[in-house]
Amino acid sequence: MSVTFEPGLLRAYFVAGSQDVPGQDLRDVLAKMLAAGITAFQFRDKATSTLTPEQRLALGRDLRAQCRVANVPFIVDDDVELALALDADGIHVGQSDQRVQQVIQAVAGRNIFVGLSCSTMAEVTAANAIAGIDYIGSGPIFPTISKADADPVVGTAGLQKLVAQSRVPVVAIGGVTVDSLPAIAETGAAGVAVITLLTHSHDVDADTAAMRQAFSK
């Protein structure tokens, strides 16, 4: 059974692929994050990942099953075929990935929600005109080490403008720390999407709780 999209799912949004947890099994890492209370998981296996397509599919099936048991949405990054094969709850695409209109058409009738990365006012304005986008990921809010080709930093002031411009909920991405959560929440963002904050965390339970609490209003 798929998880239906609602803005609260963006509060503590964990993003990871095998490349983000070297020396660890992503299944074990996700189990820990689910137990801590993440509200969404995006499978983003790319960049320096060494998995074959067959290994990626097998890993994705296991991660999808874990999310289903926890009733947490399983989102696939930038791969419509994989999202459909895994019966994902959502798919997230970037400005340079598959055209979002093509993605929306491909998942029509499959109860898969769609997220789009937008880092400028022009990109948000364009997204507002496209039916079928459920949320926007905006950033990087701060400098990030997790994405080598990241867009220029927008800061919380820039994020606030993007949130005000968007007709759909916005999740903040990039360089997020626990200390920055209050300032991000003040922009009106629905939540934060993080990699390093949790993969490098010394207290996953506390840090996940901090994310959920910051965006609980």
Swiss-Prot record:
Positions with a binding annotation for Mg(2+): 78, 97
Catalytic activity: 2-[(2R,5Z)-2-carboxy-4-methylthiazol-5(2H)-ylidene]ethyl phosphate + 4-amino-2-methyl-5-(diphosphooxymethyl)pyrimidine + 2 H(+) = thiamine phosphate + CO2 + diphosphate; 2-(2-carboxy-4-methylthiazol-5-yl)ethyl phosphate + 4-amino-2-methyl-5-(diphosphooxymethyl)pyrimidine + 2 H(+) = thiamine phosphate + CO2 + diphosphate; 4-methyl-5-(2-phosphooxyethyl)-thiazole + 4-amino-2-methyl-5-(diphosphooxymethyl)pyrimidine + H(+) = thiamine phosphate + diphosphate
Gene3D superfamilies: Aldolase class I
Swiss-Prot/TrEMBL keywords: Magnesium, Metal-binding, Thiamine biosynthesis, Transferase
EC number: 2.5.1.3
MF term (GO), any: magnesium ion binding
Cofactor: binding details: Binds 1 Mg(2+) ion per subunit.
Cofactor entry: Mg(2+)
Pathway: Cofactor biosynthesis; thiamine diphosphate biosynthesis; thiamine phosphate from 4-amino-2-methyl-5-diphosphomethylpyrimidine and 4-methyl-5-(2-phosphoethyl)-thiazole: step 1/1
GO biological process: thiamine biosynthetic process; thiamine diphosphate biosynthetic process
Residues annotated to bind 2-[(2R,5Z)-2-carboxy-4-methylthiazol-5(2H)-ylidene]ethyl phosphate: 144-146, 175, 195-196
PANTHER family given in the database record: THIAMINE-PHOSPHATE PYROPHOSPHORYLASE, THIAMINE-PHOSPHATE SYNTHASE
Task of the protein: Condenses 4-methyl-5-(beta-hydroxyethyl)thiazole monophosphate (THZ-P) and 2-methyl-4-amino-5-hydroxymethyl pyrimidine pyrophosphate (HMP-PP) to form thiamine monophosphate (TMP).
Protein's name according to its UniProt entry: Thiamine-phosphate synthase
Source organism (scientific name): Levilactobacillus brevis (strain ATCC 367 / BCRC 12310 / CIP 105137 / JCM 1170 / LMG 11437 / NCIMB 947 / NCTC 947) (Lactobacillus brevis)
